[in-house]
């Protein structure tokens, strides 16, 4: 599976150096989502997510600078955190991202997670990727409203 990662533009395998670079630069909405779900600092949440994920991609711009990070756990929980600079490559990212999601859905028949109801960019991304919003409930350490999302590969 990891050998096939090289086929995707704007994605490369993540490193711990990427986490250190991205953590202080994350979007306000992503920092708020991290705080609401886990009560962690951005660095701690990224590091923990990196360790718990089977595969983690760094999203890079045309200069190969990290602008986001994206992963999937062994159980199929998909996640994405980004900087404001992701908007600079939004169209090419979305096009390529759909290929990555389809690729991941060949290994994981069910992709899922929770998204903060206030994180409109993540909600748009999940809809673009074909996720269904199946539940709205209080979630995380701050008990904020989140949507439960799922994408099933037929």
Language-model segments: residues:
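A short helix-loop-beta-strand connector motif used in the catalytic cores of GNAT acetyltransferases and
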Residues: 46-58, 68, 109, 144
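C-terminal "cap" of GNAT-fold acetyltransferases
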Residues: 139-154
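Conserved acyl-CoA
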Residues: 96-111
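Conserved beta-strand in the GNAT
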Residues: 58, 64-79
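A short beta-loop-alpha structural element at the N-terminal edge
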Residues: 2-24
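Conserved GNAT-fold acetyl-CoA-binding loop/helix
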Residues: 28-46
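Conserved beta-strand-loop-alpha-helix junction that forms the acyl-donor binding cleft
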Residues: 108-127, 132, 138-142
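A short, internal acetyl-CoA/4′-phosphopantetheine-binding micro-motif in the GNAT/acyltransferase core
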Residues: 79-95
